[in-house]
Regions:
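A hydrophobic, multi-pass inner-membrane permease signature
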Residues: 1-202
Length: 202
């Protein structure tokens, strides 16, 4: 995301407006579920972890957020001074831009991590081996297995099973939410600072 967003934030990049229009176009008009599945299948990524990582590797919304941060926070004069000192673009990005961009990097990591953590639909489509299933899909399968049909059970047994199913459901919600809740306090200051990009400064 950074390697796309930073060049788009520089005024010296030729055709950056056309590239941004293309990126926004992909955000508005999604290719669709079946074409995406066929691409993943033709690339040989079915039943591999790459099927979850590669299609979600870059998101247009995150590119726009990072580009805005770089435009607001990294002045053109800094890049010009580094260029006069003989600093290459990659060296400037690595040595100057990234250390100054901790807030937006924390925001991007948190957004990607939460998106991957909560996504089970892609795993449901692309992964056949149970060993590769992410935690959300495992929790979903446990929840489905525990749902019982009301057959010829006694009322007391049905009530007890329903209570166990509810208890399991609430436990799964806690297990699914806990990692994100543990990470958020450490990234909160960066997250708030990064999300206030472009706000009015007084």
């Amino acid at each position: 995301t950074v390697l796309v967003a930073y060049p788009l934030s520089r005024r010296t990049l030729f055709g950056r407006d056309a590239i941004m229009i293309f990126i926004v176009f992909t955000m508005i008009f999604y290719g669709g579920l079946i074409p995406t599945y066929l691409v993943v299948k033709n690339l040989g990524m079915i039943d591999t972890r790459w099927a979850l990582l590669i299609p979600q590797a870059i998101a247009a919304w995150q590119v726009i957020i990072a580009r805005t941060f770089f435009q607001v926070s990294i002045p053109e004069e800094l890049a010009e001074a580094a260029e006069l000192d003989g600093c290459s673009d990659l060296r400037f990005l690595w040595s100057v831009v990234l250390p100054l961009s901790k807030p937006i990097l924390a925001v991007l990591v948190l957004m990607y991590a939460v998106g991957q953590w909560n996504a089970y639909f892609d795993a449901l489509l692309y992964l056949k081996s149970a060993a590769l299933h992410p935690l959300q899909l495992v929790l979903r399968s446990i929840l489905i297995l525990n749902t019982t049909t009301s057959g010829s059970m006694e009322a007391s047994v049905m009530v007890e099973r329903q209570q166990m199913a509810d208890l399991l459901k609430y436990s799964l919600i806690v297990v699914g939410s806990l990692p994100v809740l543990l990470i958020y306090p450490f990234a909160q200051r960066y997250f708030v600072k990064g999300m206030l990009i472009g706000s009015v400064k007084g």
